[in-house]
Amino acid sequence: MGLLEVAAGPNRMVTFDGRVLEVFGGSVRRFHVKLLSVTVSGPDKHGNRNVVLHQAGIENSLPVNEPTYERLQSLLEALKSAGVPVVG
């Protein structure tokens, strides 16, 4: 797998190389696939969702609108393929 890069909002970029997920924008956060799980909330009344990255008892939340959520689909599928539990 090559490097996957997805814009997750106007000031946020998410990259995944098959082993490490990195979130850029503000502070940089890194997640290893062996320690990561992901939950995705259902859409609220405005179509917004919350993608939550869980690692070692810490949660990092990525609030996204519907177009951004659609862009994240390839990333969520790649995470699932790497063995990351993705719920929602």
Predicted regions and their residues:
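Acidic, Ser/Thr- and proline-rich intrinsically disordered linker/docking segments
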Residues: 1-3, 9, 24, 29-88
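Polybasic phosphoinositide-binding surfaces of eukaryotic membrane-targeting domains
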Residues: 9-21
